[in-house]
Amino acid sequence: MRKLTLTLSALALALSLNSVADAKVYMPEKVSDGVTVAQLAEQHAIHWISVEQIEESLKGQPMAVGFDIDDTVLFSSPGFYRGKLEYSPNDYSYLKNPEFWEKMNNEWDKFSMPKKSGMELVQMHLKRGDTVYFITGRSKTKTETVTKYVQEGLRIPADKMNPVIFAGDEEGQNNKVSWMRDHKLKIYYGDADADIAAARELNIRGIRVLRASNSSYQPLPKAGQFGEEVVINSEY
């Protein structure tokens, strides 16, 4: 009798386990294929280009190329957001405050996140043997750790890392142009309209990198509006 009871108990346990295994989490019926965030970014008919396609187009001798930093290779909004709250919550005057730039250029980039697309672009150019320069519109400060964080975040070998160039931002002029000319750049990557305009002024190849939608730098620019190439999936 005891053996029969144990057998029946084991059978009941097995059946209960099978029913658990067969149970499925409820999912609604699919009514369309859906879309990812990356696919949404590609829906407009602009000149999309991938990192691989850029590399394929660059057959030949190494060259000098340049990158903007904020929203191009680094998602640095946390530092800028903190600066706005601390120095000018109601406007953007903090961007003219030397105290903010001392903080941003020396401490707050530790909260910046390297963009995957930025890393892929930089590594592609380094593999080609290109010389890479970083030209930012940030104001210059006596000391800076931006170079350190860019090098570490984008995994650039020390002997390939050039010090970050602080072009500054003056109303009515594009300070990046002279630096781009002096370093004989052939390509410049940036998220802002001014980056593409600077490249066009020098008749070099300006390639747009998408600014993340949650960037502190608003409003978002209209990528591709000048007919420039736009890097696919470069918002992150």
Curated annotation (Swiss-Prot):
Keywords assigned: Hydrolase, Magnesium, Metal-binding, Periplasm, Signal
Xref: SUPFAM superfamilies: HAD-like
InterPro entries (UniProt xref): Acid_phosphat_B-like (IPR005519), HAD-like_sf (IPR036412), HAD-SF_ppase_IIIB_AphA (IPR010025), HAD_sf (IPR023214)
Matches recorded under Pfam families: Acid_phosphat_B (PF03767)
Note describing how the cofactor binds: Binds 1 Mg(2+) ion per subunit.
pH profile: Optimum pH is about 6 using pNPP as substrate. Retains more than 50% of maximal activity in the pH range 4-7.
Binding site residues for substrate: 136-137, 176
Catalysis performed (reactions): a phosphate monoester + H2O = an alcohol + phosphate
Activity regulation statement: Activated by ethanol. Also activated by Co(2+), Zn(2+) and glycerol. Inhibited by EDTA, inorganic phosphate, nucleosides and Ca(2+). Unaffected by fluoride and tartrate.
Record keyword Signal present: yes
Keyword Metal-binding attributed: yes
Entry's EC annotation: 3.1.3.2
Active-site residue numbers: 68, 70
Gene Ontology CC terms: outer membrane-bounded periplasmic space
An example Gene Ontology molecular-function term: acid phosphatase activity
Annotated residues for binding of Mg(2+): 68, 70, 191
Subcellular location: Periplasm
Top-rank taxon, per record: Bacteria
Cofactor: Mg(2+)
Signal peptide: 1-23
Subunit and partners: Homotetramer.
Family designation: Belongs to the class B bacterial acid phosphatase family.
Function: Dephosphorylates several organic phosphate monoesters including 5'-AMP, 3'-AMP, pNPP, PDP, 5'-UMP, 3'-UMP, G2P, glucose 6-P and ribose 5-P. No activity toward organic phosphate diesters. Also has a phosphotransferase activity catalyzing the transfer of low-energy phosphate groups from organic phosphate monoesters to free hydroxyl groups of various organic compounds.
Protein name per the record: Class B acid phosphatase
